[in-house]
UniProtKB/Swiss-Prot annotation:
Residues 20-25 form a propeptide. It comes from Aspergillus oryzae (strain ATCC 42149 / RIB 40). Glycans are attached at residue 39. This is Glucoamylase. Substrate binds at residue 146. It comes from the Eukaryota. The gene is glaA.
Amino acid sequence: MVSFSSCLRALALGSSVLAVQPVLRQATGLDTWLSTEANFSRQAILNNIGADGQSAQGASPGVVIASPSKSDPDYFYTWTRDSGLVMKTLVDLFRGGDADLLPIIEEFISSQARIQGISNPSGALSSGGLGEPKFNVDETAFTGAWGRPQRDGPALRATAMISFGEWLVENGHTSIATDLVWPVVRNDLSYVAQYWSQSGFDLWEEVQGTSFFTVAVSHRALVEGSSFAKTVGSSCPYCDSQAPQVRCYLQSFWTGSYIQANFGGGRSGKDINTVLGSIHTFDPQATCDDATFQPCSARALANHKVVTDSFRSIYAINSGRAENQAVAVGRYPEDSYYNGNPWFLTTLAAAEQLYDALYQWDKIGSLAITDVSLPFFKALYSSAATGTYASSTTVYKDIVSAVKAYADGYVQIVQTYAASTGSMAEQYTKTDGSQTSARDLTWSYAALLTANNRRNAVVPAPWGETAATSIPSACSTTSASGTYSSVVITSWPTISGYPGAPDSPCQVPTTVSVTFAVKATTVYGESIKIVGSISQLGSWNPSSATALNADSYTTDNPLWTGTINLPAGQSFEYKFIRVQNGAVTWESDPNRKYTVPSTCGVKSAVQSDVWR
């Protein structure tokens, strides 16, 4: 988000936010933690989507809020970029069998059709308005000062909707894709084709110029947009004319040793935006293509080392880490927003690129080391040398093992600094790793889900990278006019007959995300925790109790909440405790009792209490 200033953390009406900072944990049992954290992250995303999300009250249906945080910083808005990335994650989960997400995806597309038509400071539907970066959660224009326009949003939104549209066609619902999805997608593609070559603000909302990330995702959107248009019986000539020019321009960001993140801004150009560009244009059918900076390409791997190395010496929490060990990763080394810290999503992006590369090497059956990528490989495997190594060779196996361990190291850093409840804010501090900036950042949770899936070799559908090979002999920053039209989606036809659909046998989940909400008036420095008879609640040990958060606390509604993943059907007893300066006060007897739901399709629950 925009880093206008670094601010003091807010106090919630007498309750210190800092008082409920998580205790840092050692990174153990990564597989087990990821299984639990993935479930938590899925629910945390749903909590941040209107109108029914627990943390998105007041947001219109389908609107994805960036964070529930309303002060220091205020992220209670919907960003087109964040929403597109988050929804693409949910669409991928849906295509993988998570049928419960269908109505959320439909509501998202309906909401975006409405938002596209809102006149705003960047313009109207057909005059640049799609480049407006953020809106109020009630689908009204945000008219305050901001870094606008931002041109990555329409491309990312188009990619998310195209993926769902392709699923519709593949499952016999072509008319829905044609009548409801394509018109909304076409607006975004028209914007990308018209404005891709013009300057705008980067994804961090700070640098005005042209950005690698924006150009990369624009290229992808135009390529898959053209294919999707043909699938629904239409065409996208403006996609076809501009995609080769965008691909040509993309090459200009390569410096010879790393990817220049932005043209403009006066910084070194070493920026995780380049790694994000690589992972969000990853095509599981692609080779290690330098032209599109595929994750396993020599360029992308060389860039990964340069970018991640730029954070090794500037964060105290990275002290003592060897060259072959993962580090906490921020946005760019010159960052000063909230004093310039590592972010959860950027650290996870560093891991995800490596998991993508591992998938690509396995699919190709070999890996190649060039002069460009040699520094990356030598840092992890000291005897690395240029050449191509088949998957049957010892060198290949040793390198793959080293890269896998290196990738896991980034996720273990996230595991260490995530809250014991699973919560992830935007950032964790460079000095001690305590969480800071906006709480429960939706993008953080989406990044966890995508990194975890790639680690498990669960990959998205291809987007056509292998067919997008044309590069003009001379680049030209051209543009093309498309077709804009106002779209109103009043309702969605019933979609049935697919795995997990309402008419299919329903599955009882193995775990349920239970949110405990207790009203307890507190004073400055006092916190509320939950402790109980099961290990997830500390086995009645106050020192192992789970801290609740006071982010929704007001004088009229002194609410403390926390979400914990628990086994379905588990019965247990619990109590709330007050903790201040190490002193523990238990609430009065009797013990509270609760049984986790074990019901078809129920993956979350809320238990509301009042302190006694």
